[in-house]
Amino acid sequence: MKSYISLFFILCVIFNKNVIKCTGESQTGNTGGGQAGNTGGDQAGSTGGSPQGSTGASPQGSTGASPQGSTGASQPGSSEPSNPVSSGHSVSTVSVSQTSTSSEKQDTIQVKSALLKDYMGLKVTGPCNENFIMFLVPHIYIDVDTEDTNIELRTTLKKTNNAISFESNSGSLEKKKYVKLPSNGTTGEQGSSTGTVRGDTEPISDSSSSSSSSSSSSSSSSSSSSSSSSSSSESLPANGPDSPTVKPPRNLQNICETGKNFKLVVYIKENTLILKWKVYGETKDTTENNKVDVRKYLINEKETPFTNILIHAYKEHNGTNLIESKNYAIGSDIPEKCDTLASNCFLSGNFNIEKCFQCALLVEKENKNDVCYKYLSEDIVSKFKEIKAETEDDDEDDYTEYKLTESIDNILVKMFKTNENNDKSELIKLEEVDDSLKLELMNYCSLLKDVDTTGTLDNYGMGNEMDIFNNLKRLLIYHSEENINTLKNKFRNAAVCLKNVDDWIVNKRGLVLPELNYDLEYFNEHLYNDKNSPEDKDNKGKGVVHVDTTLEKEDTLSYDNSDNMFCNKEYCNRLKDENNCISNLQVEDQGNCDTSWIFASKYHLETIRCMKGYEPTKISALYVANCYKGEHKDRCDEGSSPMEFLQIIEDYGFLPAESNYPYNYVKVGEQCPKVEDHWMNLWDNGKILHNKNEPNSLDGKGYTAYESERFHDNMDAFVKIIKTEVMNKGSVIAYIKAENVMGYEFSGKKVQNLCGDDTADHAVNIVGYGNYVNSEGEKKSYWIVRNSWGPYWGDEGYFKVDMYGPTHCHFNFIHSVVIFNVDLPMNNKTTKKESKIYDYYLKASPEFYHNLYFKNFNVGKKNLFSEKEDNENNKKLGNNYIIFGQDTAGSGQSGKESNTALESAGTSNEVSERVHVYHILKHIKDGKIRMGMRKYIDTQDVNKKHSCTRSYAFNPENYEKCVNLCNVNWKTCEEKTSPGLCLSKLDTNNECYFCYV
């Protein structure tokens, strides 16, 4: 029973206890205006409809129902507003008992939200231990941590990654300067041209916090003024006698505490965003504080107004995790047909609304005058015919590629036994390799040699059948949790065909550490310490608020780091944003050549260009390699450092594009080429800056380097520096020790927990970071690292490593980081406009939902599921390719090789948190609600960009068939402009809909 959530529990969640109550209703949240219920159309009312339910619903649906869910909405592609299912259902209120139970508070999301009656805004209520995040689409992001009473605002109105604290009486949504406050804690308005915060403390206003709507006003308006009658002031919390330090007083009248409830009212009045925050007890108390913390932010008039309010809340109960996302349409003028298509994408759980919306239009019969086209980017619309032709062409790959794909398929079939359940889950033993497999293995490596351009099989001896089998088996064991398409990709790494496979990385490094010394004059071990200095504390007491003393660098304003959904202080993964410049810089392969220093350096400069608003353009690595002023004969075997990279571009003042002078490792060591007239100079108007004398750093002209060893007693500061630079510049260069650590079989998806060395031999790039829970149930963080060993290594060329590493390590895995200090002008001319659909639906990241889980993860309440239960779940989900060997995982004896299952291996201490995650999605418009539900098998599933389990079957009985068709053909369609359209073309019976995958 642990494996599946009860039907009763799901129904309680779906109906949200406001229309059909499962156990009665708590009266919390009605102090100070409005019942803590969902009004304004946010009742998850009777939502009958098609048997499959919402097009946005997860195909898995709810347990005990049909395979595809049961929370009705429109069918895919149905865009007729007259359809009662596609346009939503009228909300009907049902009278129920108001009796509260303790179990009710534990098993449902307690954060309640409701539209305001007379204002464009929302009221949110709940207990003080519940957190949530709100978006005023498309401009404002509000993160509410009620446990610490911490509310932060971010905005896309200004290209900045800095948040502004609600607690601070000063600051700006657009302006980044220190602001001195009057002693009374209230600032005057500084002019309408900038966003200004005004802090006030005032009784709550009934009119602005009325939560009733036209569809259900009576349920909440009756209790709209119960808190305003209180009169006494609440004192600030005092420090206990055992407190080691005196905490500074909070600049808030309302501080959340256990057992209390909160109310946040957010609304827009003319050009002012107003936030009101109130904390109150569960019972009415005449002595309770009646003061409300109010902040007002002036917002510039923009072409695009606020159109939607999206709120995300999270709840964990008995091992089941709920994410609830409600999208309130507040000013949406999008045509009903287009809104239906887009809302279907939202309700499916698809993160890439634009791609899903684009697919929905592509699968329809072509209509050049379709009004929905204007909500896509101009580039996509102009390529519609080309995109359709892309999937209609029947051109096969060349013969060698076709035969290689066929050979890989044959080997994967032959290397596994079929068990009693008819599942291919057991690897065969060496002595079980038959003649047909031996022939296939040699044929496979012969074909691979023909298509490989890395030089692997040209420079090292090819193995025999047994060598190849052992190499492949080792690869499969280290990647036991990969799906079939990922494994097929990894079989294209030519290293698996080597006789001595460990020789593969010998000439794939190439970092030579420069001899540099610390300038002790500028060495200051305390400058990057997170603890506040006495001066900071004194200034804070005087009302001087430093927005962020360590993150505010003089060049921060010159970078476009406004993509808060994909990169912020908590997590950063721009690779998940398919429209981002950085995500379009494809992984490269340095080949059999010691040139990692070039690839890490050029990628760092490429991401800096991206953050300056330029198009994604790769720099020629071969130009840098061959324009070296020293000897060229042994260039591939020497190695160097990023310092030389900077010296070369300063000497020549020119950097051509990769397309001008393509890289081939065999050409490294040739003479520096003559620049052609048509070549593009990517260093045009670029300047290398002089050293900045940063604390704890090695400084030189054009760069700053930080050694992790110098931060041994304060690794948090080292981490903070890297995060800041990644947010601003897109990446940093990192030095690591690869020898005896990283091989061809290295797993990139698992978080590796590795020690470092006192020296380094390889240069890579840190491009992002995130959070995970390790095998001990501890919250941890990792770096996302990009390598230059090609897309068939690691996780498509990337890997993850724990930020801090094991506690016993003498050295961190990241030996050093290097940041270029260069001056490139901002490029505002070629910045592409995003699709207009993002004015109405949030541009979301899978990392956002995973981080929402992580922030609320309770170690004490964790309930990880067994491998056996996971296997059963995967079968229920209909995905036949999730994991090889789950049935017998862990059955091998300690110290002995297991040939009966694919066991996890390596140094990873990460666990895929086997908890069930249900994502409930609601779209509320004109007093009507549409719903969808998505089920994830674990927290890693939450983090995926695509999922074939979102396939839709027009007949529920064909759901498994649709998922299988998607899995089998995903590799074929993955790189197409519209994978959903590509899959649809392969569905000759027209039984499935793939725009949601």
Curated annotation (Swiss-Prot):
Provide the disulphide bond pattern. Answer: 445-497, 567-572, 581-610, 593-636, 627-672, 755-809
Q: What are the residue positions of the site described as Cleavage?
A: 200-201, 390-391, 842-843, 886-887
Q: Where is this region: Interaction with PTKL?
A: 216-253
- Is Signal among the key words of this record? yes
Q: Which residues fall in a compositionally biased region of kind Gly residues?
A: 30-51
Q: Where is this region: Interaction with host VTN?
A: 373-390
At which residues is there a site annotated Ancestral active site? 596
One Gene Ontology term of the biological-process aspect is: regulation of immune response
Which terms in the Gene Ontology molecular function aspect does this entry carry? cysteine-type peptidase activity; kinase binding; peptidase activity; serine-type peptidase activity
**Which SUPFAM superfamilies did the record assign?**
Cysteine proteinases
Question: Which family is this protein grouped under?
Answer: Belongs to the peptidase C1 family.
- Write the protein's name: Serine-repeat antigen protein 5
